[in-house]
Each structure stands twice: as C-alpha cells, then as structure tokens.
C-alpha cells in the first residue's frame, strides 16, 4: 500500500500527537468552561449532552487515530505486541464512542428532543456500526482464532482500506456535529463572533488537521527507501 509519497511517517505521527493534545484540551475547555461541565445525571440536561462531544472526540476520534498509528509509532517493536495494542485501542475507541452516543440519546430522551432526525445522527449510527464490524472482523482474522496466512494476506489490504474509510467518515461526521451544535447555539443567541464560537470552529479545524496527519502517517513509509510493494502494516 506504499504510495510513494516521498515523505516519512514520523513527522506526521508527531504532528498528530500534538494536535490530539490540543483538540482534547479545546473540547474540554468548551464543555467545562463554556457549557457548564459534564454530568451523568443532572436537572440541567445540557450537562448530560456535554459528555457526548468529549467522549466522541477524545475516545472515538483521538484514541481511534492513535490505534491506526500504532504500527507507525512503534515500527521496531514486536509485531504481536503492536497488534494487541492496535486491537485494544480500537476496542476502547469503539466502547467510548458507543457510550458517547448513548449520552446523546439520554439527553434527547430526557429533554423531549426527537432522536435520529439529522444527517449527523444517521451517519453517526452507521459509522459506529461499521467500526464495530471492522473490529470484529479484524479480531477474528488477525487475532483469535486467526485466519490462515494466505487469507490474512488477502484480507489485509481491504482491512486497511476499509478502516481508513470508516475513520475518515467518523472525522467528517465529527465536523457535522460541531457545525450542528454551533448552529443550534447561535440560533439560540450565541454571539457568532464570540469566543465560544471561535473555539468551536478552531477545535473543528484542529480535528481536521489531526485526522489528515493520522491518514498520511498510516500510508507513508517508515523509511523513504522502502522497496516497491511495501505494506505499511505488517501482514502477519
């Protein structure tokens, strides 16, 4: 899957780590400072909703991105160890994403708001479903019980391609989520040029840059002299 990009993966993994920290800090500032905090149960239902963007960004997008980059961040480590870390991080991202979606439903149900009426919600449900399927297929094929070597070799390119597709879809839906929430807030009187509006927009931009860094890191070689036919993620 080497694409001859002429760049190494390392600079993009470093950029992704830095952008991940920035995005996590920004969404926490938004949820806690501007939106009043986080709560599992509260009379102010907005505090329940605030759990949703925090878990979806930090759990689903960031941890999911780190899972994708495991083979690039630790290229000289034991492959079985990398595979386990890759699997576990994706599992954590999947669980946190599902919990984040649960809190969106919880907020809607307790606030009398309809569910699944927006494009953001439709894509969100579709994406988490595809993410779950990808994780299960990866677990069965590459981890336990594990497929035959020739099957792994045939599945691997599709596993990589489908995984990146689902991740890019999740990134696009995160952008829809930022846009939808900010539009609701502005229609309720939030200053369109105020600090909070700028924070949300800049957070969304940082997420785009983070996602782009993850994708490039995933397809770029560890070393520029990789031979033709190089596959970024090992086959076994």
Swiss-Prot record:
Residues 35-50, 106-122, 175-201 are extracellular. Pfam families: Cytochrom_B561. The keyword Electron transport applies. It is found in: Membrane. The keyword tRNA processing does not apply. Keywords: Electron transport, Heme, Iron, Membrane, Metal-binding, Oxidoreductase, Transmembrane, Transmembrane helix, Transport. InterPro entries: CYB561/CYBRD1-like, Cyt_b561/ferric_Rdtase_TM. Monodehydro-L-ascorbate radical binds at residues 116-125. Heme b 1 binds at residues 52, 120. Its cofactor is heme b. The chain crosses the membrane at residues 14-34, 51-71, 85-105, 123-143, 154-174, 202-222. Binds 2 heme b groups non-covalently. Heme b 2 binds at residues 86, 159. SMART domains: B561. One of its GO terms (cellular component) is membrane. Two-heme-containing cytochrome. Catalyzes ascorbate-dependent trans-membrane electron transfer by utilizing a concerted H(+)/e(-) transfer mechanism. This is Ascorbate-specific transmembrane electron transporter 2.
């Amino acid at each position: 899957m080497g694409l001859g990009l002429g760049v190494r993966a390392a600079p993009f993994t470093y950029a992704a780590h830095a952008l991940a920290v920035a995005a996590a800090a920004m969404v926490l500032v938004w949820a806690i400072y501007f939106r009043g905090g986080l709560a599992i149960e509260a009379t102010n239902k907005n505090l329940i909703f605030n759990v949703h963007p925090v878990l979806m960004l930090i759990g689903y997008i960031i941890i999911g991105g780190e899972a994708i980059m495991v083979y690039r961040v630790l290229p000289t480590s034991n492959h079985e160890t990398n595979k386990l870390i890759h699997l576990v991080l994706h599992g954590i991202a999947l669980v946190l994403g599902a919990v984040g979606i649960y809190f969106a439903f919880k907020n809607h149900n307790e606030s009398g708001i309809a569910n699944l009426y927006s494009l953001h919600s439709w894509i969100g449900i579709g994406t988490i479903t595809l993410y779950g399927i990808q994780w299960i297929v990866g677990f069965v094929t590459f981890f336990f019980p594990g497929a035959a070597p020739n099957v792994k070799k045939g599945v691997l390119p599709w596993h990589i391609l489908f995984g990146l597709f689902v991740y890019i879809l999740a990134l696009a839906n995160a952008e829809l989520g930022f846009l939808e929430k900010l539009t609701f807030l502005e229609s309720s009187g939030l200053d369109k040029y105020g600090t909070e509006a700028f924070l949300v927009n800049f957070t969304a931009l940082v997420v785009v840059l983070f996602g782009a860094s993850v994708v490039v890191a995933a397809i770029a070689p560890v070393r520029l002299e990789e031979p033709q036919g190089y596959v970024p993620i090992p086959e076994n």
